[in-house]
């Protein structure tokens, strides 16, 4: 997904804990404690370990995942949190390594200089040996393990009685384990943003925003590097923390090194309604230029992304949740290459049982489907899992 879209559109669905889960959300437990230790065990079946268009390899997967979350208010104005999770996946039919270790670590520091002047810094590090979502169109049964380190910073300060300014920064590093994927996709993405909002009403803010993005590839950057400038306007709405709606619309000016530049529309709209305890509906739509998994044939992808997520308690102890994302896109061909249209759908459903505050039992199913004009980019993947999480 385009880093600008990820940064300012999808943060509302990013989990603060690094414990990996299915596409559908899992209800939070043990809220309000400074230190939480969790151990998750799972048994799953994956129908397409490497996301291959043909010759898929399936396997049972046995998982043990310990993790720890620590949160502390250092002073009345300073908050610090840290987390780490280790995930051990054992496969019965995977070629090569059958025991994979994945790591997730995060560190967050937030400080309020005053009631309305706030600095928020967050760093997230991940080594994903068994990625949740797989790339389409890579070589058959390639190991898609990758490392990502992402730093986010945000500084908010009042500019006038009803005007607030915000400076945002993100830097994300991607490194792939497979040598071919590494040559094609290793990169660093840097994003800067400046925004000003005006309080039209206590619950409504009008927003104007500028963003600048640089994408630098480690190999053959002279053919793949990009620079983008975004200008957009929109509004944010919040009512008693139960209903939040946010929208931006504007233009992106993208300069491609070694290829033609482009001007494209940019839009992001999202909303969340928390209608009861442990119950919410979350949705959004975004349109942008995004990076592609096939950098040899395509510059980038012009994508429309829509998603909806629902969590609802069936009883005091049973919660059902589901998530659907739809992404029709057009891959922008390099000189001499035709454009390719494709649609990606990801769906997940989870049923959770919380017998005590320290136990969570869940069963989930996730479906991935990519239909492309280019047959090598088609993808079918189904995963079933049952898991238990114990908190201490």
Predicted regions and their residues:
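Cleavable N-terminal export/targeting peptides
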Residues: 1-29
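Gram-negative and organellar
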Residues: 22-392
